[in-house]
Amino acid sequence: MEKFRKGSTTYGNATFWTQDNGILYCKLRNLQPDLKLDYKSASLYLDAIRKLSADEPVPLLIDLRDTKGTFSNDAAHLLSDSFSNMPFVICEAYVVNSLSVKLLVQAYKRIYKTNIPYALFNRISEAETYCLERTAELCQ
C-alpha cells in the first residue's frame, strides 16, 4: 500500500478521502429522499476511488448514515460491473443508521452481485476493524 495516494475529493453529495490506516473512506450526504444516484455521478465516484487508491488494493468504507434516496438502475449496473472488475477494492464496509438504507444496501448486493466481500455496521469503528482485518487476511 505504499503507493496509496493521500488526499480528498468531493463530487456532489459524496466526499472521498484516505487516512494513514490504509482505508479509503466515502461519506454520502443526501437529505432528499426522492433523489437518485445517476450514472454520471456513479462514474465520478468510481473515478475518485481509482485515483485515491492509486490502483492498490484497499478496503472501502462507505458512510451512509443519515443519507436518504436511492440509485438508478443504470448507476447500480455501473457500480456492480465496475466493482466486479476492480481488483484494488478488497472489501466494502457500509455504515448505516436506518432500516431503509440497510435494506437498500442488502437489496443492491442481492440483485447486483459482486465478488467483493461486504458487511454492514452501525458504527465507524466496527467498519474500520472489519476493513483492517480483511486487509490483514490478504497480507498473510
Regions found by a protein language model. Name each.
Residues M1-Q140:
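Amphipathic, Lys/Arg-enriched alpha-helical "gate/interface" segment within cytosolic domains
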